[in-house]
Amino acid sequence: MKSIYFKILILAFMASSLYSYAWGLTGHRVIADIAENHLSRKARREIKKMMGRERLAYWANWPDFIKSDTTGAWKQASSWHYVNIDPQTDFKAFEQNLKAQAGPSLYTQVNTLSSQIKDKNTSEKDRKIALIFLIHIMGDLAQPLHVGRAEDLGGNKINVTYFGEKTNLHSVWDGKLVDSQNTATQNILSF
């Protein structure tokens, strides 16, 4: 059964990426807040039933936090945070490349997670986890270095100096841009 509120959630996340300049902790929370601010009443009710009283921003970083889990319980989700593409690829070649890749990616998981959330036969716990991941990976999908070349590991192999600090391009884009502004989340949301 297709539900309009999930379509609205996905559209809100996609729209939020237009206003997002970085992702890290602050960026993921801001993206989730922007998406939540654009939900219909029906979508908001349905998500509240599933998630409880916490805002979407509360859960937005959980998929990054569990990457450090040493039990291996979430190992299969590590590839959900990015997709490798050749920058000279058109969409048709991109789709063929995805089919040739082993395992899921950020791009393929959007549909998989959306289907799990909509499937009433999926347990409430699994639907909640799918929504938490969807909240997070929609932000990752909008971050240019999570959709890029495998050779530079999403900018992790590109060394830069940012305000006198040696770091890498991914780190700058993922958090330092927003965090260095010392701007309250509320101010970011008003852009």
What are the roles of these predicted feature ranges?
Residues 13-14:
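Sec-dependent N-terminal signal peptides of Gram-positive bacterial secreted proteins and lipoproteins
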Residues 21-137, 144-191:
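N-terminal, motif-rich segments that launch catalysis or mediate targeting to/interaction with membranes
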Residues 17-19:
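N-terminal signal peptide c-region/cleavage motif recognized by signal peptidases
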Residues 1-8:
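Bacterial N-terminal signal peptides that target proteins for export
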Residues 6, 139-142:
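Residue-level micro-sites within transmembrane alpha helices that shape
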